[in-house]
Each structure stands twice: as structure tokens, then as C-alpha cells.
UniProtKB/Swiss-Prot annotation:
Keyword Ion transport: no
Highest taxon of source: Eukaryota
One Pfam family, short name: Patatin
Name of the gene encoding the protein in the UniProt record: PLP6
Protein name as catalogued: Patatin-like protein 6
Organism: Arabidopsis thaliana
Keyword Protein biosynthesis listed: no
């Protein structure tokens, strides 16, 4: 080992300051080493070897010149005063001490938003509160969700919220605030859902849901007004927005990482949003092509493919070593998953349900399936995090409400009364105790409320953001044009393995 280090430093061993002196001290002063010493190294010899290697390592990596002083500082145990940074240093870096974080890998921050139609008001209110908490804890009145999350995934209405929060017209700041998400749905939802759809299939779906149809043209107009000619490349951070492709009979992920590699995977954002919210029986399917016209997709609701896209986002990070080179496992992630509410108080009249035919079960079956799938993903992700789930994974979900039974068409009812009820459910949800999935233990009610959990998360996000300026290596290295694409089939394969 020493011979190798000699070659690295290009100088003889005895020219390294203090080395001869150390050898003489450890061997009685004459510098001689007996055969017994070679065969049975003492504790002092082992300690000496460690100190020598530390000196060589420090000289090679950091250029220290005073080796004896360095060795003495290493041999002393740090006092409590030495371990604590001065108040001035803490204040200068907002509580971040450079020496304490330079060797940490940091955490990749992930945001995921479920599908759920008008129930999207619930996660929208949670996003608005989180952004407010980020402004408060960072001291930055212009703080945005996109400043603190590295990856975002959203399905259905969650996909539209994701695009709103991360799309940028100038490549610097997002177009929308978090408050705009739920207000967009509350104010414009009625224009999307107030039209009775034509066609036999849509009439069947309408009959089964007991609710209204939708106007795809008005939704399309709203998306065009919001995003104009922006594409997936125009998002500030990696985004993942799913749909179900009828041409391939498989899920399809719209991905910024793919779009940066080739125009064949770059789509206009308004089309992406229209596709992920193309609920069967409510909005028409969307035939769309990539910006270069080479990739064709006939898309329907992303909620059919993955109502809870958290697993897709996590898998994307774990396999994307170009953008997230230092992630070794879920312990290096900080994940926020927002649900659209498990409203178990949906009212079904037993006598009527007993007489339902297949057409009547259409929309209720879709809703039950989507909510069940979202909960299954939550359970699987929680199991994957294991013992670190409380510090690395946060799920915010409404579990019932005090507003009484909900209508079966709560997802598509944009009436003022339903909107007001959903706003009330969202505010009540933030006050509810946070519930987490426990390995083989169902749901566990925590002592913290969802408000408190989001406050804690905001603090962690701000701290992670500050620490990154003090680290030697970057936590993230976002992809530029021409980089290798993460294969979608790999992502879907690993999602399947989680179950």
C-alpha cells in the first residue's frame, strides 16, 4: 500500500513530514522493526498505520501540509464545543453547517398526486397549504412547489396539477401557484362536466354513474389557454404523467426525460393534460402525436392505468442514474403522495343496487377499482420503505368526513354544492390525524395531524434545499438533450414487482 502511495505522490516516504519521527517513536526510537513485530502487530502499530494512511489520504485529497498537526487533531476526541457550530455560522447558512453535510448524499424529493376528477380539490388544498408552509419556513415569499421537489408524477386531474406546478414559459419560474390548482377545478369544473355526451357508450356510463357527462372541447380549450405551445421539455423538473394507450393496450408515461432525448417522445402539454384526464364515458379519447409526428397515441384516463402514480415515480428515480446518480435505495428519497380522498360514505341504496344491471355498475366499478388500486400502491410503497417510512414517506389522504354521505357521482358533479362540500372535506382532511400504512398491520393513526405532517415535510424540504449548496457532489443532475432515456418497460416491470 505504501509503495503505491509513493507512486501517487511522486515523493519518497521519508520526505512526508513527521513520518520518520513517528516510526522511531513507535519502535523504541531506533526505527528498527523486528520479525516479531511484523508477524504480530500491536495495537499501537495498527493505530500508527491508520494515522499514516489518514495523513497520506488527506495530503492526496485535500493538500494538507502540516501532517503532525492533522494527526494530532484526528487523535483527539472532539469536545461538545467543537461539534457545535457557532451561532454566527448557523445564522449565515440558515442553520446548515457545511462540515456536517459535505459527505451526505442527500435526498431526492418526490411528489405524487392521485387521480379523482372533482375530488382533485382535496389534494389541491393540500398543495396550497404546503406551498404556504414553504414560504414561511424558507423566508422566501416567491417560493413554489417546483423549487423543492425534484420529480413530480400525477394521474388524471393529478397530472394536470403536475403540469400546472412545473410548466414554465421562461425556463425559470412555474406558470401557476399551488393555490391555482384547486381554484382551477372549482371555477372551471362546471364547464367541463355540464354537457350530456352523445353515443351509446357514454349514455351507458352516464346512467351507471347517475351524473353528468362532460365537454371534451371545453376541457381542450382550457388546456390550450393554460399551456399554449409548451411541451414536456418546458417543465422545470422531471415529470411523469400516465395515460392508457388504446393502440398498444398498455399504459403510456409522458416523461420529460424521454422528451429531452428525442422529439419522438415530446408532446404538447395541453394534449398530455387532455389525455390523462380523458375519463371514459365523460370525455372523449384523445388521438395525439408527438411533436415530430412519429409517435401516435390514442389516450384515455391515466387513472385507469395507475390511479396512484407514486410507484412509477419512485421506480423512475431508482433507475435514472444519470439524473440521480447517488440514490442507492428508498432511504435516499423523500416522498409526498397526495390522495383524492377515500370517501367511504358514498351513499348507495341497497334496494336499488340489488337491481343494477351491468350498465349501472360501470362508473361505480371504475371508482371502486381506482380507489382500491391507489390504496394497494400506498401499502406496497409503505412496505418498501419499511422502518424508514415515517422519515421518508408521507401519504396525505382524506379518510371519510363529517359532511354526511356523498353522492355516487361525486367525481363528476361540479355543482356549487358539491364543490363547497369538497372544499370542506379538504379543510377537514388537513385537521385529521395522519394515517399511515403499516407492514401487515393495516392503517395506523398517528399523533400528528395532516397539517402538522405537511409542516414537518416543508421543514425537511427547505433544509434539504439549503444543504445542497454545501455538498461536494450534486444530489441531482437533471438531464439535458441527447442523454440516454430510461426505458418505460423497465419502469412498468418494476412496478409490477412491487406487488
Amino acid at each position: 500500500m505504501l509503495t503505491t502511495m509513493q507512486r501517487v505522490h511522486n515523493k519518497p516516504i521519508d520526505s512526508i513530514g513527521g513520518f520518520k519521527h513517528l516510526v522511531k517513536q513507535s519502535n523504541g526510537g531506533d526505527g528498527g522493526v523486528t520479525a516479531t513485530d511484523m508477524q504480530e502487530p500491536s495495537i499501537e502499530t495498527d493505530k500508527l498505520s491508520y494515522e499514516i494512511f489518514s495523513i497520506l489520504e488527506s495530503k492526496f485529497l485535500f493538500g494538507y501540509d502540516d501532517d503532525l498537526k492533522l494527526m494530532e487533531s484526528r487523535s483527539r476526541d472532539p469536545s461538545p464545543e467543537q461539534e457545535t457550530a457557532s451561532p454566527a455560522m448557523v445564522e449565515a447558512l440558515n442553520g446548515v453547517v457545511p462540515g456536517t453535510v459535505k459527505n451526505q448524499r442527500g435526498k431526492v424529493c418526490v411528489l405524487s398526486i392521485d387521480s379523482g376528477g372533482m375530488r382533485g380539490i382535496i389534494p389541491g388544498k393540500a398543495l396550497a397549504y404546503l406551498e404556504h408552509a414553504l414560504k414561511s419556513k424558507s423566508g422566501d415569499p416567491n417560493a413554489r412547489i417546483a423549487d423543492y421537489f425534484d420529480v413530480a408524477s400525477g394521474s388524471g386531474i393529478g397530472g394536470i396539477f403536475t403540469a400546472m406546478l412545473f410548466a414554465s414559459s421562461d425556463g425559470n419560474r412555474p406558470i401557476f401557484k399551488a393555490e391555482d390548482t384547486w381554484r382551477f377545478l372549482a371555477m372551471k369544473g362546471k364547464s367541463f362536466y355540464n354537457k350530456s355526451p352523445p353515443g351509446i357508450l357514454n349514455r351507458v356510463m352516464k346512467t351507471g354513474s347517475g351524473g353528468s357527462g362532460g365537454s371534451g372541447s371545453k376541457l381542450e380549450k382550457a388546456m390550450k389557454e393554460s399551456f399554449e405551445e409548451l411541451t414536456l421539455k418546458d417543465t422545470l423538473k422531471p415529470v411523469l404523467i400516465p395515460c392508457y394507450d388504446l393502440t398498444s393496450s398498455a399504459p403510456f408515461l409522458f416523461s420529460r426525460a424521454d422528451a429531452l432525448e428525442t422529439d419522438g417522445y415530446d408532446f404538447k402539454l395541453w394534449e398530455v393534460c387532455r389525455a390523462t384526464w380523458a375519463e371514459p364515458g365523460v370525455f372523449e379519447p384523445v388521438e395525439m402525436r408527438s411533436v415530430d409526428g412519429k409517435t401516435r397515441c390514442v389516450a384515455v384516463d391515466g387513472g385507469l392505468a395507475m390511479s396512484n402514480p407514486t410507484a412509477a415515480a419512485i421506480t423512475h428515480v431508482l433507475h435514472n442514474k444519470q439524473e440521480f446518480p447517488f440514490v442507492r435505495g428508498v432511504e435516499d428519497l423523500l416522498v409526498l403522495s397526495l390522495g383524492t380522498g377515500q370517501l367511504v360514505d358514498v351513499k348507495y341504496d341497497c334496494d336499488k343496487v340489488m337491481k343494477w344491471k351491468a350498465k349501472h355498475w360501470a362508473r361505480p366499478a371504475v371508482r371502486i377499482s381506482a380507489d382500491g388500486a391507489a390504496d394497494t400502491v400506498d401499502q406496497a410503497v409503505s412496505m418498501a420503505f419499511g422502518q424508514c417510512r415515517r422519515s421518508n414517506y408521507v401519504r396525505i389522504q382524506a379518510n371519510g368526513s363529517s359532511f354526511g354521505p356523498c353522492k355516487p357521482n361525486i367525481d363528476t358533479d361540479a355543482s356549487p354544492s358539491n364543490v363547497n362540500m369538497l372544499v370542506g372535506v379538504a379543510e377537514e382532511m388537513l385537521k385529521q390525524k395522519n394515517a399511515e400504512s403499516v407492514l401487515f398491520g393495516g392503517k395506523k393513526i398517528n399523533e400528528e395531524s395532516n397539517y402538522e405532517k405537511l409542516d414537518w415535510l416543508a421543514g425537511e424540504l427547505v433544509l434539504e434545499h439549503q444543504r445542497r449548496s454545501c455538498r461536494i457532489a450534486p444530489t441531482v443532475a437533471f438531464k439535458q438533450s441527447g442523454d440516454r432515456r430510461v426505458d418505460q418497460q423497465t419502469i412498468f416491470k418494476d412496478i409490477d414487482c412491487m406487488f
